[in-house]
Structure formats: structure tokens, C-alpha cells
Amino acid sequence: MQVTMKQLLEVGAHFGHQTKRWNPKMKKFIFMERNGIHIFDLRHTIDAIEKASRMIADFVRQGEVMIFVGTKKQAQEIVKEEAERCGMYYVNERWVGGLLTNFSEIRKRIDRLEEMIRMEERGDTSKFTYKELKEFKKEKDKLMKFFGGLRGIQKIPKVVFVADTKKDINAITEARKVKSIVISLVDTNCDPDVVDIPIPSNDDAIRAIKLITSALADAVIEGKEGKVIELEKKEEEEKAEELFLTNEEEIEEFMKEGFDKEMEEKEEEE
């Protein structure tokens, strides 16, 4: 899926945080300031999504795997749905330390989960006492909670997508240590230098997270199908970009439509 400027505007991807909370390293991604809020230059967002999509598709064609990470409440269900849709892996609960840097040990815990699932399917648990069954279920539920999205993973992922650099900094730190490529949404209060491909965007709005995560999941699917991503700018997109760049009054009017709702979501996070 090719993401357009119009789509990004509609989901509120252009809303940053309050200007007083910004990270100066994000300056190059900011278009303007309105009502004390930084507004993203969505040209950079589109460029980053396209770059990430091409890279993901290329690696998937080569047989590499990817993990989607989103442990904050707005992203949890999205990363699960999109990872499952494209047949990749995900973490949407707490990041377990060593997941990448001590991968062989983590694999043992995933293997244990698989064995417990097989035991249930074979009916082995029918022989358990009440206490044994209770302990079995407790262990299985815990493993499923933290490792259910990693079932079947056999090697360290080449690409790690993170929905929030601050919330999931541990995932980023481990990914960099094992030389995985990190793609992440970066809001105006984030440090873009901690990831390989920063995607400047509102990282609190559910619809923005969904749109961008879906685009990356589509890239996985295209890579599996052996397709080369070719991006052509449509006439509609060119008009939207021209509007965004040249007519600030129209932008401001558009922004007002979803401004209050988007700011409420950000204030909850802050």
C-alpha cells in the first residue's frame, strides 16, 4: 500500500507534541508550529515509509524475518493484527530482556510453549491433578502472553519495527546490539538518531499507527510474493502535497477538524 499525504492528514499523523517538549534533533522533520504544537512536514514521512517498505520487501524476498514491536496500549492490538496478517512476528506485551541478545535462551522458552500446546492437543493434561493443571495453565498463559507472537521464529530478525521509541527503547537497544535494522515512528519529542529509519509521525494517534504499520505489513506481503515495490505519485497525491506546502490557511482549517481529539490522546500520554 502506498501511503499518501491525504491519508496521513486524515489520520492526524502531522500532529507533533507541544513545542516546549520537542527534541531539537527533530527540527528537520518539522514543517511549522501552530497553537503551541509542532506540525510535521509529511514529505519526510512519506519518504521514510517508502524507504522502509522497499527495504523490508527486499529482505523478505531474501528469506529474512521481521518483528513488530508495540507495547503501549494504542499499538498493542495493531502490531498483533498486522504481524499476523503478513505472517511475521510481534511483541505487544512487556519486552523480555535478552529476547535478541540472548536469543538461544529465549528460544528455549518458546520451545517450552510449543511443547505445552502439543500436550494439550494430545490430551496429556487430562491426567493432571487439579493442582498440576492449575500450575500448567499458569505457566502456559504467562509464556503465551510474552512469547505467543514469536511462535515459530527460528532466527534473529533482520528488521525490527517499533511503534514508540521511548516506550520500547529496550527493544531498540537490543536490536542495535545484534545489528538488526530498526524502523520506528518518531514523534517531535523523540531522538531520531537511535533508529536506522525514523518515520516522523504522531505516535499516539491510533489511526496514524495503524496506517503506517499496515503499509509496512503490506511490504512484507509484497516481499513474500516476490514483488518489487514501484512507487508512482498519483495526480491526487501531487495536489495534496501542493496544498500542504503552499496553503497554510487550508492546512490550518483541515487541522481544526481533528485537533481537539488528537490533542486529548497526546495529553493522556503526557
Positions of predicted regions on the chain:
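Ribosome large-subunit tunnel/peptidyl-transferase-proximal elements
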Residues: 1-185, 191-201, 206-209, 213-228, ...
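Intrinsically disordered, compositionally biased charged tails
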Residues: 1-6, 222-270
